[in-house]
């Protein structure tokens, strides 16, 4: 069985390593799409209970809702920290920024939560993060590849 869930959050970041205008501070209303798999439906005929995913929803909000994400190796870290100290931004420090890394980060967090709640019955098949209609990245569970017949 497979089930999708979508969530939107607004964040700001820059890609300081980029040679293009992407190295400038800019923001997105990110859309997260999570696909869950299971060995079968539960007693309520659900793959997962979305009402029970409050921890994941709160984590997404904490990480990506009106936040400024900065990479640990950003050469302007001191400047970004100054903005945080002046309460001008709500900073989150991550290993790297971008759709690919946000998909991976969210996949890891969601997988941990789903395993804690459901054990082996459910898992995260994939996480897609969209910046806009023309740019997205997907992190796929390579241990449990998506079965199109589910």
Please give the residue ranges for each predicted region.
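Single conserved hydrophobic/aromatic residue that forms the stacking wall/gate
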Residues: 1-12
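Residues in well-ordered beta-strands of folded domains
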Residues: 5, 70, 128-130
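Structural motif
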Residues: 7, 29-31, 133-136
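Conserved beta-strand segments that form the floor/walls of ligand-binding pockets within enzyme
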Residues: 11, 35, 128
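Histidine-centered catalytic/metal-coordination loop motif
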Residues: 15-112, 117, 148
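Amphipathic alpha-helical surface "interface" segments used
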Residues: 77-84, 126-134
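Catalytic phosphate/metal-binding cores of nucleic-acid and nucleotide-processing enzymes, i.e., regions
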Residues: 120-124
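Short, low-complexity, polybasic intrinsically disordered segments
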Residues: 128-150
